[in-house]
C-alpha cells in the first residue's frame, strides 16, 4: 500500500507574478509527488471556483493562503493514510469533503494541487513515468501542438479582439520535427514584425502582441512567416483561432472594437466562415459566447463538418455540460483545462466522454502557468491527440514542450505523431 503520510501546501507564484497553490504529498516509502496549479485570465462563468483570499493589501487580493490552509488542515486530515494509488477514491473523498457543486468551499486550486500531487507520488512509487501511470501500455501517441504565436484579447494589450492566433504543424513525422517547425515559424514571424517596426514584445502565453489593423492582416502575416520559414501553409502548417468570444459579447452583439464591428450571432458565424474560407484554419475555439447556445448551434451547423469547433468557456471541462452539448449537437470538440474542474478523475471522465461521442479533446494550459508539466503527461497518457500550451518562448510554456520531447524519446520506436488525423472529428 502506498500510504500517504504527509501533505504540505504552499503559496508560490505563477508566470504572471500572481500567487498559486503548490502541494507536496509524501508516501510511507519516502516517495514524494509535487504539483502546482495554473490560473486563467479569460474564464468561463461555470468553472470550478479558484479560492482567493480577497485581502486587498496582500497581492491585490489574489493571495491563496486560505486554499493552502485547507490543504494543510482539513484535506490533510481526510486523506492521511489513504492509498495514493487509489486516485478515484481519493478524488471522491475530496469532492465529498468540499460538499459543493463548484468546489467553492475548499477551492478547486487546493483540490487540484492535491489530486495531481497524489498521482505524481503514486507514479513515482510504481516506478512509472507519469504518462505511463495515467495511460498504461496504450499511451504512445504524442499530441499535435496548437502554438499561440500571436496574442490578443485578454492575453495582450493590443487592438486584436481574437485572443489567440495559432499555428498547427501537421505534416511532420515526429513531435520533435513539429516542434522545430513551430519554433522556426515563430522566429520567422519575429523577423517580419521587426522589419516592419512592429512590437516583438510577448503576451501572457509567449506569443507576439503587435497592433495589427485587423484579424485578416494578422492571419496574412502568419502565412508569410510560414512561407519564410520554408513551410507550406495549408499543407505543412494549419491555423487555429481562440476567439474567446465571451470576452467581447455585450448587449447581445459580438463587438469587435479593433475592427469597429457589432455583429449578431448569425453575422459573427458568417464572419468566422469567411475567415475559414480565406485561410487554412482547422480549429476555432470559443467562437460564440458561452451562453449563446443558439449561436453555437448556428456555427456548428455552418462549419462543424470542416472546422474543429472547440468549447472552452462553453463546456468548462464539465461532463454534465458536455453531455448537454453533445445531445444538442453543439461544437465538436472540448478544451480540457484541469483547473476548470478541479480533480484528475473528473478531467479524465470529460476526455473519455468526448471521445465516445466522436468529439476531440484538446489538453490545455492556462495563461497563468508554472513550471509544472503534468498536462504534457496527460496529453500522452490519455492519447488526447492535441495540446495547447502556448508559444515558443517563456519557460512556463516551453516546460511542457520539453516534457513531450522527453516522453517521445522514452517511447522510442512506438511513439506516433498523428498530424492531420488528430482531427478525427472532421473525417
Curated annotation (Swiss-Prot):
Gene3D superfamilies: Enolase-like C-terminal domain, Enolase-like, N-terminal domain. Its EC number is 4.2.1.11. Keywords: Cytoplasm, Glycolysis, Lyase, Magnesium, Metal-binding, Secreted. It catalyses: (2R)-2-phosphoglycerate = phosphoenolpyruvate + H2O. InterPro entries: Enolase (IPR000941), Enolase-like_C_sf (IPR036849), Enolase-like_N (IPR029017), Enolase_C (IPR020810), Enolase_CS (IPR020809), Enolase_N (IPR020811). (2R)-2-phosphoglycerate binds at residues 163, 337, 366-367, 388. This is Enolase. The lineage of its organism: Bacteria, Pseudomonadati, Pseudomonadota, Betaproteobacteria, Burkholderiales.
